Regions:
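Bacterial Sec-dependent N-terminal signal peptides
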Residues: 1-24, 336
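Surface-exposed, beta-sheet-biased, low-hydrophobicity segments with strongly acidic/polar composition
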Residues: 20-336
Length: 336
């Protein structure tokens, strides 16, 4: 990447009624961090990939989403270990778990929204009371856990885990070694709920972890697992990719095959989606030994405050630094 154009890029530019600026983001050498990006403030908070393992939604009194941390760095082209979740294929927490029987029952986060995570992937979609890890009981106004999982941690250790309940605003869950030793029971209270709130938990510290910036964030830049084609472009399978996800409460729409200087957000104002990977990872491609950026693609991002930004990604340096740069244009508050 040419440093000279970056210096020039950070000069504040006014085009018509809108202001353009450039924002530098990074997920570190070897993609070893997650970046929580605030577009308006032009800031980011960096968190180590292994800072947390589970994330519980705390958006309202009705949600019960639970995510795993799929972020993993790389070294010499090889992915480092990450948190993995499997169906234990047993009925009771005390049952014997056979690891060889669970290898084909892995659960991943879906990038469809922040409503459901990996722990919710086994739910029956047509049943609004089914949260995957448990079912809502209307008469008791609680979610009762009914599924046992196995977590493979980054250090190679296995833990069995059960989300026992969500009563009111309190999650209760337990985990232990596969032989039942070192059992830990934890509770997490959602309060105060917020439309953008996730509560992060570390299996290493056995406690809640402070991950997100105090002033909020709009984007997450780092690693996650997604369907992607192999380097030859022939086989599509799950890969650990480097990309940008929108945060809870943030929506986005992609404008592809356009002139990024003249494209209007008004043509896309009815197409915003809460799907988290609208920006995703495929705005870049490895050509030989260097990265090429799609120059006919813009993204319109609507933040929690209903402010609309045009995002055009300008540069990506790969695993050597994890650095990227995007151009941002403040388009003001949306009336929709």
């Amino acid at each position: 990447m040419s440093r000279s154009w970056i210096v020039a890029a950070f000069v504040f530019i006014t085009v018509g009624a809108f202001a353009q600026d450039y924002q530098f983001i990074t997920c570190g050498p070897g993609y070893n961090k997650q970046s929580y990006v605030n577009i308006k403030e032009g800031t980011e908070k960096l968190v180590n990939n292994d800072a947390w393992d589970l994330a519980f939604t705390a958006f309202s009194f009705q949600d019960a989403g639970i995510f795993i941390n799929e972020s993993s760095g790389s070294t010499q082209g090889q992915n480092l270990p990450l948190t993995e979740l499997y169906d234990a294929r047993v009925t009771n927490f005390t049952d014997n778990i056979i690891l060889d029987s669970i290898t084909n029952s892995r659960f991943l986060n879906s990038e469809k929204s922040w409503t459901y995570g990996a722990f919710n992937e086994s739910r029956v979609i047509s049943d609004p009371y089914d949260f995957g890890w448990g079912k809502y009981v209307p008469s008791a106004q609680r979610v009762n856990g009914n599924k046992i999982y196995v977590l493979k941690l980054r250090n190679g250790q296995y833990k069995k885990i059960m989300i026992e309940s969500l009563i009111g605003t309190t999650y209760t869950f337990k985990y232990a070694n596969l032989d039942g030793s070192n059992e830990v029971v934890k509770t997490i209270n959602k309060m105060p709920v917020s439309p953008t709130k996730l509560i992060y938990f570390s299996m290493t510290t056995n406690d809640i972890v402070d991950v997100t910036p105090s002033r909020g964030y709009d984007l997450i830049y780092g690693r996650y697992i997604s369907l992607a084609k192999d380097p030859n472009g022939t086989i599509e399978q799950q890969y650990n990719v480097t990309g940008i996800l929108t945060g809870p409460g943030t929506k986005a729409v992609a404008a592809k095959g356009v002139n990024t200087m003249t494209v209007s957000h008004l043509d896309y104002e009815n197409s915003y989606s809460a799907q988290t990977d609208i920006i995703g990872y495929d705005w870049k491609a490895l050509v030989g030994t260097s990265w090429s950026i799609a120059n006919d693609r813009a993204y319109f991002v609507k933040t929690v405050e209903n402010r609309v930004w045009k995002i055009v990604i300008k540069d990506f340096e790969g695993s050597a630094t994890g650095n990227a740069v995007f151009e941002k244009t403040d388009l003001g508050i949306s009336s929709l």
